[in-house]
C-alpha cells in the first residue's frame, strides 16, 4: 500500500519569521490521522528568515535530525556544542535524559531552509549526544542514519535507516523492503514515480505491505528514504 501525503495538504503555520509545513501533528496543528508513521513523529519543512531562529528550549527522549537545504544553521546546546551546519549537512541530536538547545539563521540577508525530523528512540533515558556530517553526493543512495553508524553514517537510537537518494532524470532504481518493514519517502526536490504513484517536491509517501520500491526520476530529484520498524 502507498499513501501519498501531498505537500499542500500538510499542516501550515506562518509566523512571519518562520514559515513551517507539518507532515504530522505539531504545535497548533492537530490531525488524529497524522500523528506519525512508525518511529517517525515529526517532519517539519521550515523556512527561517535572516537573523531569526528558535531560542533556547528543552527536549527529552527524542532523536532530533536536521537536514539543511539552503543557508546555514547556527546550533548551540547545553552540552557545550556551538556549531555551524551548512547546506548539505545533517545534524543528529539525542535528547535522551534532557538537553537544551537553540537553532538560528546567522545570516543577515539569506533565508534558511531545512527539514526538522523527530524520531522516537527505542529506549528512553539515554545519554545526550550530538553529531553532524555532510551527505551531498550528486547521484546515488547514501546511508545517513543507522543503529550501528556503519559506512560512515550517523548513529540513531532506533531500528531504522535513513538514506539520501539523488537521482538523475530518467534514472530507474529499486529498493528492496524486508518483511513487515515500513517505508516513508520524503521528496526533497524534483518529480518521481514510485510504484506507479507520482510525487513532487515536498510530497511524502507512506509505504507498507510492499516487497520493493521501484523509483523513476521524472526530473533530477532527491528523496529521503526512511526504512522503519513494524508498528
Curated annotation (Swiss-Prot):
It catalyses: quercetin + O2 = 2-(3,4-dihydroxybenzoyloxy)-4,6-dihydroxybenzoate + CO. Keywords: Copper, Dioxygenase, Iron, Metal-binding, Oxidoreductase, Zinc. The keyword Metal-binding applies. Binds 1 divalent metal cation, Zn(2+), Co(2+) or Fe(2+). Its cofactor is Zn(2+); Co(2+); Fe(2+). It comes from the Bacteria. Its EC number is 1.13.11.24. The keyword Metal-binding applies. Pathway: Flavonoid metabolism; quercetin degradation. Is composed of two structurally similar domains arranged face to face. Has quercetin 2,3-dioxygenase activity in vitro. Its physiological role is unknown; however, may provide a mechanism that would avoid inhibition of key cellular proteins, such as DNA gyrase, by quercetin. This is Quercetin 2,3-dioxygenase. It comes from Escherichia coli (strain K12).
Amino acid at each position: 500500500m502507498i499513501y501519498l501525503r501531498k505537500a499542500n495538504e500538510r499542516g501550515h503555520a506562518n509566523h512571519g519569521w518562520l514559515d513551517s509545513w507539518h507532515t504530522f501533528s505539531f504545535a497548533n496543528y492537530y490531525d488524529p490521522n497524522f500523528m506519525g508513521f512508525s518511529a517517525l513523529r515529526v517532519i517539519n519543512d521550515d523556512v527561517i528568515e535572516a537573523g531569526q531562529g528558535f531560542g533556547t528550549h528543552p527536549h527529552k527522549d527524542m532523536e532530533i535530525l536536521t537536514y539543511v537545504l539552503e543557508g546555514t544553521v547556527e546550533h548551540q546546546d547545553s552540552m557545550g556544542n556551538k556549531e555551524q551546519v551548512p547546506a548539505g549537512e545533517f545534524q543528529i541530536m539525542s535528547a535522551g535524559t534532557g538537553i537544551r538547545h537553540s537553532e538560528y539563521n546567522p545570516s543577515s540577508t539569506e533565508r534558511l531552509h531545512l527539514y526538522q525530523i523527530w524520531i522516537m528512540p527505542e529506549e528512553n533515558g539515554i545519554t545526550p549526544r550530538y553529531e553532524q556530517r555532510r551527505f551531498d553526493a550528486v547521484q546515488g543512495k547514501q546511508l545517513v542514519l543507522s543503529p550501528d553508524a556503519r559506512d560512515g553514517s550517523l548513529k540513531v537510537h532506533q531500528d531504522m535507516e535513513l538514506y539520501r537518494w539523488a537521482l538523475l532524470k530518467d534514472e530507474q532504481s529499486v529498493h528492496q523492503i524486508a518483511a513487515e518493514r515500513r517505508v516513508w519517502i520524503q521528496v526533497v526536490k524534483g518529480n518521481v514515480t514510485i510504484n506507479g504513484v507520482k510525487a513532487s517536491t515536498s510530497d511524502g509517501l507512506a509505504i507498507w505491505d510492499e516487497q520493493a520500491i521501484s523509483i523513476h526520476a521524472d526530473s533530477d530529484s532527491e528523496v529521503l528514504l526512511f526504512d522503519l520498524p513494524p508498528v
